[in-house]
C-alpha cells in the first residue's frame, strides 16, 4: 500500500473506492494498491 497526495489508476482493473473519506485504489495487482493522504 502506497500513500500519495494524488492517486492514479495504473491499469484498467484498478478500482477507486471511498471509505470514511479515505480514497483508495484496489486492484488484483498488489503493487497498484494506493491510498490518498
Swiss-Prot record:
<keyword id="KW-0687">Ribonucleoprotein</keyword>
<comment type="similarity">
    <text>Belongs to the bacterial ribosomal protein bL36 family.</text>
</comment>
<protein>
    <recommendedName>
        <fullName>Large ribosomal subunit protein bL36c</fullName>
    </recommendedName>
</protein>
<keyword id="KW-0934">Plastid</keyword>
<dbReference type="GO" id="GO:0003735">
    <property type="term" value="F:structural constituent of ribosome"/>
</dbReference>
<dbReference type="GO" id="GO:0005840">
    <property type="term" value="C:ribosome"/>
</dbReference>
<keyword id="KW-0689">Ribosomal protein</keyword>
<dbReference type="InterPro" id="IPR000473">
    <property type="entry name" value="Ribosomal_bL36"/>
</dbReference>
<dbReference type="GO" id="GO:0006412">
    <property type="term" value="P:translation"/>
</dbReference>
<dbReference type="GO" id="GO:0009536">
    <property type="term" value="C:plastid"/>
</dbReference>
<dbReference type="Pfam" id="PF00444">
    <property type="entry name" value="Ribosomal_L36"/>
</dbReference>
<dbReference type="InterPro" id="IPR035977">
    <property type="entry name" value="Ribosomal_bL36_sp"/>
</dbReference>
<dbReference type="GO" id="GO:1990904">
    <property type="term" value="C:ribonucleoprotein complex"/>
</dbReference>
Amino acid at each position: 500500500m502506497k500513500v500519495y497526495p494524488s492517486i492514479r489508476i495504473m491499469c484498467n482493473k484498478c478500482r477507486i473506492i471511498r471509505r470514511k473519506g479515505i480514497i483508495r485504489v484496489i486492484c488484483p495487482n498488489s503493487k497498484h494498491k494506493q491510498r490518498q493522504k
